Structure formats: structure tokens, C-alpha cells
Amino acid sequence: DESELYQKINEPEFRAEFKKHVSEIFTVGLWHRDFSDGWITHCPDESLVGKNFKQVGDEYGVDPVDAYFDLATKYKESLRWMTNYSNARPHIMHKLIASPFTHIGFGDSGAHIRSLAMYNFPLRMLKYVQDAKLKGEAFMTDGQAIHKLTADLADWFGLDAGHIRVGDRADVVIINPNGINDDVDKISEAPMEGFGIDRLVKRNDDAIDATIINGKVAYKKGDYFDADLGKEKGFGSFLENRFVEDREVNKQSDSINKPAFSQFYL
């Protein structure tokens, strides 16, 4: 029950336990737990927008954790805030992106629809490359970036994809370089059908001119999505790993051999 949850965070015992865990540096995980890096983006009290919880706590003479819980109790879902838990050091991030041991994969946004919107990793990487080049600090060429997002991934996972070759299945994304702008970082909200809630999304409307799957135009700027997308077959197919051998049944032992991979790169 929502009311019980808000009542819970006002219990002195709960807050004391919460502060204890926040201060335990050896158990820090994905989030750094530093409320001085928790910045208010939306609040009925507009004077608080742009401030972090430590600043608010200093103004009211309370601990940053208490400032956070007090505001959360008072404004509930009308209070919005953000923090940075990754990619805070560009020079390190550039090295990681350029490393042959790094893949630009997926975000965990699908499991956190109300708090994360990192669906556009590939576009965000292209913006990192573009921004660095404009600053005269290029760490990767455009061609290397596209290769890392396509052929590099396909070759690693043994998929017949990621290359443009005569006779291949036509899976193509047409990107407008001028659309790789600050909008790539903007977060929007959109209704999630069937659940009665809004989820966080990133639009990137100016970045993608068209998406072609298996030779069929799935999306075209201005025309939006094909009416058959997600309803009719033909837009995609199962991509089999070409490194996996066929499973064979050993009739004598009645056992099944496990798939064998040709090689791993570590």
C-alpha cells in the first residue's frame, strides 16, 4: 500500500537503518549513494529545482537523506530527480568504447521503465564519437564506430549479419548525422499500452530517417511505422549462431552432446 510505504520512511528506525547502509562504502553497487549528486528536476516548489539533496539539507539544517525523504513524503510523485551513475569520466569512457574488448550492447531499461531510458546506446555512442571529433579529441573514426555497432557484434556472436554484401539480407538503418544532437539525451514519457502507466523513452526523431528489416521498410521518417510491423511475418527471422554445431543424439548412451563453439576470444 502506497500510504504505508510513505509512513514507513518517516519512522526514525527506518531512516537510521537507511543512513547506515548509505554510508557503508564497501557495499556500494551500481549507485554511488551520494545524495549530493541527486539533482531535483521537477518539484512543486520550483525554488528547489536544480539543487541537490545535500544543498536542500544544508538550507533546512537536516541530513541529505532526511531532506530527500521529507520532500518525497511531501510531494510524492511530483518530485523528480536524477543522478549520474556511469560515464562520468569521458577520457576513461572513450578508452572503453575504443577497446576491442568492449561491446556496445543493450541497457537494462526494459526492467526499469519508470527510472531508466537507455534504449539508444548505439546513437549515444555515435554522439560521443561526434562530440570528441568536434573538440579535436577524436578517439575513433566514424567508420570504426559503425563497424563496432554492426559487424563487430555480429562476428563476435557468430551471426550472419552486420555486413553489407551482395545477396545478404537487407537489414539497414539510415542515420542522419545532423540528427545526432542533444536530443539523443532528452528523456520523454509515453503511454505504455495495457498497463495504464507512462514509461520513460528517448525519441531521437531527427536521428533516424529509415529502418529496413529483411528488405522491408519498417520505419520511414514522416510515415512512421509500417502497419504490418509486429503483425505480419517477413520483417525478421531467427539469427542462428554459425559457431554452434548440430546437436547429435548418441543412440548407444542415449545422451545429447552439448553445442560446441569453434573459438572464444578473451
Predicted regions mapped to residue ranges:
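Active-site neighborhoods of metal-dependent hydrolases
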Residues: 1-139, 178
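Hydrophobic, well-ordered secondary-structure elements that form the walls
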Residues: 61, 108, 126, 145, ...
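Hydrophobic alpha-helix feature that most strongly marks membrane-spanning transmembrane helices
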Residues: 73, 101, 127-134, 150-154, ...
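Flexible loop/turn segments at secondary-structure boundaries
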Residues: 74-78, 111-115, 153-156, 180-183, ...
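Acidic, glycine-enriched loop/beta-strand segments at the rims
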Residues: 79-87, 93, 140-144, 154-189
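C-terminal cap of metal-dependent C-N hydrolases
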Residues: 95-102, 107, 121, 174-231
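Alpha-helix capping and helix-loop boundary segments enriched in small/acidic/polar residues
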Residues: 113-117, 161, 199
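Intein/HINT protein-splicing elements and their conserved insertion hotspots or analogous self-processing inserts
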Residues: 219-266
